[in-house]
Regions:
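Short, functional N-terminal and low-complexity linear motifs
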Residues: 25-32, 48-52, 142-147
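Hydrophobic membrane-insertion alpha-helices, especially the h-region
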Residues: 22-42
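Aromatic-capped interface at the extracytoplasmic side
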Residues: 35-55
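Soluble "head" domains of membrane/secretory-pathway proteins
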Residues: 2-22, 57, 61-193
C-alpha cells in the first residue's frame, strides 16, 4: 500500500496537533505536581508555634513545628508520639503539644515518681527525674476505647496534661496531628522524637 504524501497544510496541522498534545501532557504534569504539593502542605505542613516550656527539652519556647494531620487518618497514635491536641470542644479552644503515654484500654498509674502501664513500669526516655505530682493518675486512670493519656516532657515544672483533672484524658477526636519536625529556628531544625 502506497502512502499519499501530505500537503503543506496537512503537515502544518499535524505539527500543531503534536505540539498541542505535548503542551497538554506538560500542563497535566504541572497540575499533578501542584495537586501533590497542596496535598503535602495540607497534610504534613500545618505549623504551630510552641508558646511555653512544657515540652522542654524536646521542644522549646518559640520553636515552630510542623504537624502531620494524615498519619492518624490511616493509623492510630503510638506511645511516645508527640502530638498537638485541642483541649475543649470549640475551634477556639487552646492547642497543646504533649507526648502520648497511655493508649486506649490501658490503665495508667503514677506512683513513687514512676509511670506504670497496666502495672508495668514505663521507661521515660525524655526525662529520668521522678514525677513529683501524679495528679489523677495517682490511683490509676483506665482509658476508654478512644482515650489517650498525655504528659508534658517537663512534667515537674508543668502540669497541664492528663494528670490535671480539668484536662484529663484526651479523646482521639482532640488529636490534631503528630508533631514531626522542628522547622525553626534553623539551629534546631530536625525531626521530633
Amino acid at each position: 500500500m502506497r502512502k499519499v504524501p501530505l500537503s503543506k497544510k496537512q503537515k502544518r496541522a499535524e505539527k500543531i496537533k503534536k505540539t498541542l498534545i505535548h503542551v497538554g501532557i506538560w500542563l497535566l504534569g504541572l497540575l499533578i505536581v501542584i495537586a501533590l504539593g497542596v496535598f503535602a502542605v495540607r497534610g504534613f505542613g500545618i505549623k504551630t508555634v510552641i508558646i511555653d516550656q512544657s515540652m522542654n527539652p524536646t521542644l522549646q519556647n518559640e520553636d515552630v513545628v510542623l504537624l502531620n494531620k494524615l498519619s492518624y487518618k490511616i493509623g492510630s497514635p503510638k506511645r511516645m508520639d508527640v502530638v498537638a491536641v485541642r483541649i475543649g470542644a470549640s475551634e477556639n479552644s487552646p492547642t497543646y503539644v504533649r507526648r502520648i503515654i497511655g493508649l486506649p484500654g490501658e490503665t495508667v498509674q503514677i506512683k513513687d515518681g514512676k509511670v506504670y502501664i497496666d502495672d508495668t513500669e514505663l521507661e521515660l526516655t525524655f526525662d529520668d527525674a521522678a514525677i513529683e505530682n501524679a495528679g489523677v493518675a495517682e490511683k490509676g486512670e483506665t482509658l476508654g476505647d478512644n482515650e489517650y493519656f498525655v504528659l508534658c516532657d517537663d512534667y515537674n515544672n508543668n502540669r497541664d496534661d492528663s494528670r490535671l483533672d480539668s484536662i484529663g484524658t484526651i479523646d482521639s477526636d482532640q488529636i490534631l496531628g503528630k508533631v514531626w519536625l522542628i522547622r525553626s529556628p534553623l539551629s534546631r531544625l530536625g525531626l521530633v522524637h
